[in-house]
């Protein structure tokens, strides 16, 4: 199925690209979320009329994400207190939700979907580097310090 992308989609294309995707992906994800429209003749003409507006919106979203990334980096580190055993192992784990709440409490609004924990949940005390994906191509890193309660 041919669609026109209205937003930058990772591994698929940029704003305005006409791409061929599976019909289920288009019907169930891209079109309902407003990230694409079917590539009919009328939609192509309508998109070309709105191209500048959509590209300006995409640039504004990128600039906002870069500003948030600078705020996250400026925090330096965030401390999270959790119950732990004698050997430095946590009772439970620090998940993306816990990291997002700690960063939001520190003053920068972060959604849990933006937190990336590549090694899974944090299960030990100490310093851990956590990545945040604030936009398709904007990343920030923050030091999360886990201490015993």
Swiss-Prot record:
Keywords: Ribonucleoprotein, Ribosomal protein, RNA-binding, rRNA-binding
PROSITE patterns in the record: RIBOSOMAL_L9
Origin superkingdom: Bacteria
Lineage of origin: Bacteria, Pseudomonadati, Pseudomonadota, Gammaproteobacteria, Pasteurellales
Gene3D superfamilies assigned to the protein according to its UniProt record, in alphabetical order: Ribosomal protein L9, C-terminal domain, Ribosomal protein L9, N-terminal domain
Protein name: Large ribosomal subunit protein bL9
Pfam families reported for this sequence: Ribosomal_L9_C, Ribosomal_L9_N
Protein source organism: Haemophilus influenzae (strain 86-028NP)
GO cellular component: ribonucleoprotein complex; ribosome
GO molecular function: rRNA binding; structural constituent of ribosome
UniProt keyword annotation of rRNA-binding present: yes
Function: Binds to the 23S rRNA.
